């Protein structure tokens, strides 16, 4: 990180992670894979590791949430490293787990009981939130979202923002990133996010304009 003049380093787990898969191999290997990523992250000094939670396609919602909670508990059992695990909110496609703050609250509350003294954080993806029906574009809608967060996971649990515009309309339940200002959210949504969340923002957009996305995000933060 010193070589590249980076203050912080973040790692994303593989996208095939699924704590609620009906495939025993996929479900049972997920905790081991994420734990290994955590340990590697700790070795290189990564601040956070974020993971998707998967989908409960062949189980009820309650069963999927319980399996996810058990899996995350297995990841953290005995873990003493400094790198913190973050759960990423999903876009709500199909039967994906963690597309609402209520579901994330359920998972966090049960993890807090299983692994006393370790705090799991949350990674917000702006495109995922918008696709799940959270209107971060509208100021009044955004205020309501902040109140929901306060009553569920808590603002203090939000550790990182994936700053992506969305090609999908509000509530469209698909994960399609767009460049900042080019999608359905617009720059105003990122002004809303930056006005509340002072954590790092990461652009997950295509290489053709990612530098422009970063410039826009920096301008937004500098002009608040």
Where do the protein language model's features map onto the residues?
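Terminal, non-globular segments
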Residues: 1-9, 16-17, 24-27, 79, ...
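Short, electropositive alpha-helical surface patch
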Residues: 1-5, 25-36, 61-74, 100-109, ...
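Short, well-ordered coil/turn segments that N-cap beta-strands
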Residues: 3-9, 43-47, 80-84, 116-120, ...
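Histidine-centered catalytic micro-motifs
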Residues: 9-17, 53, 124-126, 163-165
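Short, solvent-exposed loop/turn segments at secondary-structure junctions
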Residues: 16, 56, 92, 128-129, ...
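Active-site acidic/histidine proton-transfer and metal-coordination neighborhood
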Residues: 20-121
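Acidic/histidine-rich catalytic cores of soluble enzymes
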Residues: 74-177
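A short, acidic, flexible beta-alpha connecting loop/helix-capping segment that sits on the rim
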Residues: 200-211
């Amino acid at each position: 990180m010193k070589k590249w003049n980076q203050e912080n380093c973040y790692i994303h787990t593989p996208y095939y992670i699924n704590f609620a898969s009906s495939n025993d191999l996929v479900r049972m290997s997920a905790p081991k894979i994420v734990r290994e990523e955590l340990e590697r992250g700790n070795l290189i000094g990564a601040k956070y590791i974020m993971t998707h939670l998967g989908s409960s396609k062949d189980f009820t919602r309650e069963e999927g949430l319980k399996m996810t909670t058990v899996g995350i508990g297995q990841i953290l059992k005995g873990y003493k490293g400094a790198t913190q695990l973050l759960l990423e909110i999903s876009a709500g496609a199909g039967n994906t787990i963690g597309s609402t703050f209520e579901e994330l609250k359920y998972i966090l509350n049960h993890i807090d009981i299983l692994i006393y003294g370790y705090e799991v954080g949350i990674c917000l993806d702006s495109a995922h939130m918008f696709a799940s029906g959270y209107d971060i574009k509208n100021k009044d809608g955004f205020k309501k979202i902040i109140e929901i967060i306060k009553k569920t996971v808590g603002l203090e649990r939000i550790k990182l923002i994936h700053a992506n515009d969305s090609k999908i309309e509000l509530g469209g339940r698909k994960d399609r990133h767009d460049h900042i200002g080019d999608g359905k959210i617009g720059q105003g949504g990122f002004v809303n996010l930056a006005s509340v969340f002072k954590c790092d923002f990461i652009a997950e957009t295509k290489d053709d304009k990612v530098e422009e996305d970063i410039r826009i995000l920096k301008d937004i933060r500098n002009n608040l």
